[in-house]
Amino acid sequence: MNIDFLFETFRKNKDLTALVWNGKKITYQFFIDQTELWAEKFKEEGISAGKVVSLEGDFSPNCISLFLALIAKDCIIIPQSNTNRVGREIKDKLSQVETYIYCDENDNVTWESTDLVSNHPYYSKLNKIKKPGLVLFSSGTSGDPKAAVHDFSLLLEKFKMDRRTFTTLNFLLFDHWGGLNTMLHTLSNAGTIVTAKNRSPDEIGKLIQENEIQLLPATPTFLNLMLLSGISSKYNLSSLEVITYGAEPMLQTTLMRLKKAFPKIKLQQTYGLIEVGVLRTKSKEDDSLWLKVGGEGYQTRVVEGILHIKTKSTILGYLNADTPMSKDGWFI
């Protein structure tokens, strides 16, 4: 099974808190048990290996355990946020969804089957090699969103390496690879994920104080709002050790203000693409936007001012566009 390594970690840490959701502490034992229950439910619902499943929700107990169970079943997963339905019809049509699973804000689960039978060549390839798939969508800011198809087993490889983990606020959405990357990194290292009812500065400040959160992954837009709202004077944020930022451009002025407001907190820029995953990064200084990307499993080069990336976890391709690859196998 492609996630045996995860469940080995879960079993070793079964009594530890894996998730804090709506103030409730969920242990690793819950995810062991619940994933097994979903596997039985899949039999009833006709969800077999290779089935294309849209999973809509947030980082709730049922949604996370369903996500893990779908990987274990070698399904092709389209993660969808239950707070962002922009362009949903286009995405559903592109991805040839065969089954919808919905997790509402109270973590109730509903199922809906379609009459579609997926037949895209990339899906057929995943079925042939008996691997789970993951479909991620671009933002669509310059046109229709692109649907990137991954062999999920290759993306999971990096989570097999032991790394330091934190009590982490899973700020980014469920349909964002940054959010899924944070979740998988935390769970694979027996850390604790804390989820938010909403992503307002006050809610985040309250959660940091109550749960002694150490790592806050966020967007520059939110971090600017956090500074403007003055939550550092309303809540005790002393537990924070690291703030990571990405998903959109950071202004130098905002970064300087962050460093001044939180001089003891490490500020780290992240870099990722739906086509290759999240790369390891290194900055000159916390208040510098200069960034070196790469790390284990990634090769980089610059050709005529354009970044090229090579990694085993590069997408199989897009469902609805040509994949920009060089003749010698680099993603452009």
Predicted features and spans:
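Conserved AMP-binding A3 loop
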Residues: 27-28, 125, 130-160
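Conserved AMP-binding/adenylation subdomain of ANL enzymes
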Residues: 156-167, 175-215
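Conserved ATP-binding/catalytic segment of the ANL
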Residues: 306-332
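Flexible, low-complexity linker/hinge segments
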Residues: 106-132, 149
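Conserved AMP-binding/adenylate-forming core of the ANL superfamily
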Residues: 7, 15-46, 150
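Conserved AMP-binding/adenylate-forming
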Residues: 24, 40-83, 171-173
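ATP-dependent adenylate-forming carboxylate-activation enzymes
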Residues: 57-58, 77-94, 191-210
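Gly/Ser/Thr-rich phosphate-binding loop
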Residues: 215, 229-287
